[in-house]
Amino acid sequence: MDFFDEDRPRFVFQSRPSSSHTAEEEEEARIPNKLFISISVSISLIILSLSFFYFESEPAKSLLLWLSLSFLVGPFAPSSLTGGKIRVGYGQILEPEQIHDESSTDNERESRRKSVNKRSKGSTKSDNPPENASAVTEVSRKVVIPQSKESGSVNETKDWTAEEIEILKKQLIKHPAGKPGRWETVASAFGGRYKTENVIKKAKEIGEKKIYESDDYAQFLKNRKASDPRLVDENEENSGAGGDAEGTKEIWSNGEDIALLNALKAFPKEAAMRWEKIAAAVPGKSKAACMKRVTELKKGFRSSKTPAN
């Protein structure tokens, strides 16, 4: 019987040819084939004749000249320029690439494995139901308690008391519209019990119009306006004359003009409900009459200024 040694294989396969074959093939490769040379030269001559006699346009003519030269020079070109042979086992043997930073790659692999393991553990924990329901409820209570404290520290607009509403009204009067940082200062008056958003919502619900109507000074001016006898006499004169409202012209006294100017100084343009306050400060005059009188005074001032210049 014949015994075969498995450690020593009989056939050895080589990816590259032996040195004797390579030397012979290199010599053959250096000598070009006559048939191949004749075919390439004939093709180059045909293309060259076509480029000179049949194609007069410039791009086609230049392309044909380039093709004819390539067919003529191609067989005599070295293999290093034309790419050499593409058969398996020919050419230079490539050296194996050197792997740098092996330690860094190992660390990256370990970190990826750890992250995958953590994700798998987290998914298994979420999938499994809790064993002790009481423990879960206790934990949820512990988590909910600080939230309830925080929510208690900052109340909503529903829990406002009458005293807090009065404080809000006073703060809104103290800090009028247009003042920088108005709502922050108003909210700070409550000692952190309400956020600025809740204060703004509550102020919108109440309405600044009602707040300003509750002012004692405004009420005094309105009562003075209603009880002014000059207003009653003026209405009687207008009704007796029977003229239209557009045709009649209101008469302003010096005291009313002074009161109007003082009101304009007291309530600047940035103040809320400016003209209502000005009309309340001038007895017997409406908002439209005050606005009209201001325009008349401006025109008179400009007309008196032009002749002086």
UniProtKB/Swiss-Prot annotation:
The gene is MAMYB. One of its GO terms (cellular component) is endoplasmic reticulum membrane. The chain crosses the membrane at residues 35-55, 63-83. InterPro entries: Homeodomain-like_sf, SANT/Myb, Zuotin/DnaJC2. Residues 56-62 are lumenal. This is Transcription factor MAMYB. CDD domains: SANT (cd00167). Induction: Induced by auxin. Keywords: DNA-binding, Endoplasmic reticulum, Membrane, Nucleus, Repeat, Transcription, Transcription regulation, Transmembrane, Transmembrane helix. GO terms for molecular function: DNA binding; Hsp70 protein binding; ribosome binding.
